[in-house]
Amino acid sequence: MLAAAFADSNSSSMNVSFAHLHFAGGYLPSDSQDWRTIIPALLVAVCLVGFVGNLCVIGILLHNAWKGKPSMIHSLILNLSLADLSLLLFSAPIRATAYSKSVWDLGWFVCKSSDWFIHTCMAAKSLTIVVVAKVCFMYASDPAKQVSIHNYTIWSVLVAIWTVASLLPLPEWFFSTIRHHEGVEMCLVDVPAVAEEFMSMFGKLYPLLAFGLPLFFASFYFWRAYDQCKKRGTKTQNLRNQIRSKQVTVMLLSIAIISALLWLPEWVAWLWVWHLKAAGPAPPQGFIALSQVLMFSISSANPLIFLVMSEEFREGLKGVWKWMITKKPPTVSESQETPAGNSEGLPDKVPSPESPASIPEKEKPSSPSSGKGKTEKAEIPILPDVEQFWHERDTVPSVQDNDPIPWEHEDQETGEGVK
C-alpha cells in the first residue's frame, strides 16, 4: 500500500526523460517532499536499532573469545555482525542522504564505491550463512564430538569469504560514475557499447552467485542439520548436546530465512532495472526505495534474532552488562589499603609443583650446617638431656626407621634378652 502510494507520487512528479536512466549510489531524483522525508527517516530508525543490537552481539562474542578459545560458529556470527555494522555505519547514512536530495553532491568516489560496498557486504553475509550452515551440519551430526579448529583455519575462511565477496560486484565499481543530464549532476551506471554484452551477462549471473546458489546450499545444509537433530540420543549427555544443537540450528535457520525474505524485493528491483527494455515500464521508485530499506533492515533483524532465540547470547548480555556495572575505579581508601594487603595476597600465587620454590622450607631435608645455623640464629639454649636424646636418635640405623614390620623384630629382641 505504501509502495503503491510512492509509485503514484513518483510517476507524477518525476521527469519522464529520466525513466530510461540506470541510477546508482542510491540516487533517485523526485520532486515529492514526502518521499524524500519518509525513506531517510526509516533508514535512520533502522540504523539506530541495528547499531545497538550489533554492538551488543559483537561485545558478547568478543567477551566470550577473551575468556576462552573462539569457535568457528562464533567467529562466523561475529563476521556476520561486523558486515551488518559496516552497512549501517557507512552505507545506510549515504543512502539516506542521497534519497533526501534531488542532485548528487556526494562526490565521485562515493558514487563509484557505494553500490560496490553494499553488494560486497551483502555477498559476504550470504557466503557466511553458507559456511555457517555447513558447520552447523557438522556439529549436528555429532554434537558430543569436540572439534578443535585452529585460528589459522578461521582466518583463512574469513579472508576467502571477503575476497570472493569483493570480486563479485566489481563491475559496478567500474561503470558507476557521475554524469550531467539536462543540467543536473547524477550518479549513473554508464556502460559503454563495448561492454554491453558483458554487463548483460553480469546482470544475469550476479544474482545467481550472490543470492541463488548460496541460498540453495544453505537450505540444503540446514535441512540436513535439522534432520540430524530429530534423532534422539541414548545418553543424557548426548541428549543435552542434541537439544543445544537443535536450538543453534533453528536460530541460524531463522537468520537465513529472514535474510532471504527481506533481501528478495531488492533482487526483484535489481533484475527489473538491469533488464529494462527500451519500451518497457520502469520499476516504481517507491518500490525501489522500500526494497532498499528492507535490505538494510536485515542488519537490524539479525542481532534481535540472536538475542531473542539464543539463551547463550542472553546470558552473555547479562554478563557483559554486569561486568560493565561492577567495574569501577578504586577509591582512595581501597588504594591505601592495597599495600597492607599485599603480604596476604602473595601466598595465593602458588608456584608450580615442578619448581623448587614450591617445596616449603620445613619439608626440605635438614643438614647439620643448616640446623646449626638456625640454632645459632634463634639463640635457644640446648639442655643436656635433649642433646643426648637427639644424639641417640641420630645413631639409630635408618633401617629400623623404615622397617615395615617392627613388631617382629621387637619380639626377637625380647626373646634374646630373656635368654
Curated annotation (Swiss-Prot):
Acidic residues compositional bias, start-end: 410-419
Topological region Cytoplasmic: 63-71, 138-153, 223-252, 308-419
GO biological process, one term: G protein-coupled receptor signaling pathway
Residue ranges annotated as Extracellular topological domain: 1-41, 93-116, 175-201, 274-286
Pfam families tied to this protein: 7tm_1
Tissues in which the UniProt entry reports expression: High expression in the spinal cord.
Family as reported in the entry's similarity comment: Belongs to the G-protein coupled receptor 1 family.
Protein name: G-protein coupled receptor 151
Lineage: Eukaryota, Metazoa, Chordata, Craniata, Vertebrata
Encoding gene per record: GPR151
